[in-house]
């Protein structure tokens, strides 16, 4: 076959065939299909084409890489050339100004030598302008007058921009400002670039050529970024002034290029002049030679004073000190907070034993500005507006750097605000669904876990700042109040049963005890915050029991209970046993009869259930509320039995009522008194007095005197 050649020769021929200018893919495929013997030839040809494709791809990658490197080098050379051309242009401009000044000086000298010739030249130039005015038109004064004239058009900048001999206008022009997020036009501004700062002013709508002050940016903290053209947005550049940025649009590409070049050159000249000034100020100045004196004691005084003069010279020409402000800007921009604080510590250590001279004060002023910027960034890192994910450890970096900057109080305040927002968000995100007890379990787990983690992180971050712990205690109390609000809203405001409320409070107390592992006991706080709601719940449930007891008393027939089945009787025995009534068998009769009234049995079970649930809620502040509620409940039953005993005329029913009264006084009341003393830890005199009042009924059952 013509195309089935060796691997090497076939590959080179195939390459030449594909690279030829007259190559036609359709004709090539048609010819290939006609000359192939079968599928195998086509597969081999396909493999050769794939190998050629891979080889071509690798060659293309190598060429792209080589060209890319050449492109980078070319762009760098162009940038260098552009910078040199601009410097050359600047030098030529200065030379032109010098030559004009020299020419003007020579003309003035010639005019002095020949007044008649000077008068003729002045009249020819401008007959209305006196010669003395032209003599005052020196280069520096011209710049100063131009700056003053322009700034007179800007309202509100006279006090912010005091005139100084070295300040002059470099460049100015109109720009359009755009929103950085939506790229929408905001306003038209006029920018004044001076040799040490950039002034931005907005145009006044009703006054042509007049402006209002908007912002002033020192060149040291200003960065210029070219914005790539993206039609219709073009001819734009961005100014970065930490922590904000602004985007401006020039009238055309030429003006944009001029702005970029002039800004960079002015920044560079400013940095060089500042560096030279610091170097000159850092050089030790020779002490003035004192006049000779015949006093022999002055020599010793001079020898003692010489070292102090040497000590006043602080060497600020070190490279790392010169670059310190820029290095701090880089660290802040790159979020290298540790590196920035390390640089500040290094500077403070270097200047610790040095005298405070004027150059040191100026350096301190620059560094203090960066410290304020760094502090603002760290404060923003700890603000609740930031993401609250990651737990309290996510704030450790910013907190530790603020503490190193000597702002532990601010770090403590921001840390606690951040954690308060995190706890509040976590509680709000809990879904209220299912049983109340299930929600309370979730609520307690979320809140107390967050509180425990915050306490441990606080102890780690502020280990050496004992003064901050009082702030944490105040924060913990405030957080506990937020937790109790959510807890009470779900448990007490929704009118849950007393048993459910007791279980929920028990869960909260158990979680609160976990904080004692780190030495934080907030039990008294949760008691103080819950006491009002628990009092309301106890009184509400007491009223329910009293109403139910009165309703049963109104329907009382004083008949024995018939439980019908042994199972029901056994169940009642178990219920009474769980209530603490161990001698209940003496009140049971034959078959399934019970020698007690249904009303008295129901009252016993309800009262003991109330006491058990109330004891789960008990703490000392609730002592009198619980005791008074018990007395009120018992009095309702006691008064009813006493009244029925005095009013009943049937001897058989009267004996049955007396049997119920005996059960109430001799069995139920001692059980209530004993259980109350076990739960509270001390006896209740009111319950003892109530039980002793039953003696009156036992001594004189026919008396009409009430037990109350």
UniProtKB/Swiss-Prot annotation:
Record gene name: EXOC8
GO biological process, one term: Golgi to plasma membrane transport
Range of residues in the leader sequence: none
Bias type Basic and acidic residues, positions: 271-282
Principal localisation: cytoplasm
Organism whose genome encodes this protein: Gallus gallus
Pfam hit, one: PH_EXO84
Protein name: Exocyst complex component 8
Region (Disordered): 271-314
Subunit note: The exocyst complex is composed of EXOC1, EXOC2, EXOC3, EXOC4, EXOC5, EXOC6, EXOC7 and EXOC8.
Gene Ontology CC annotation, any one: exocyst
Biased composition regions of type Acidic residues, renumbered to the chain: 297-314
PH domain ranges (all copies): 168-268
Entry-linked Gene3D superfamilies: Exo84p, C-terminal helical domain, Exo84p, N-terminal helical domain, Pleckstrin-homology domain (PH domain)/Phosphotyrosine-binding domain (PTB)
Compartment(s): Cytoplasm; Cytoplasm, Perinuclear region; Cell projection, Growth cone; Cell projection
Upper lineage: Eukaryota, Metazoa, Chordata, Craniata, Vertebrata
Record keywords, A-Z: Cell projection, Cytoplasm, Exocytosis, Protein transport, Transport
Keyword Transport: yes
Family of the protein in this entry: Belongs to the EXO84 family.
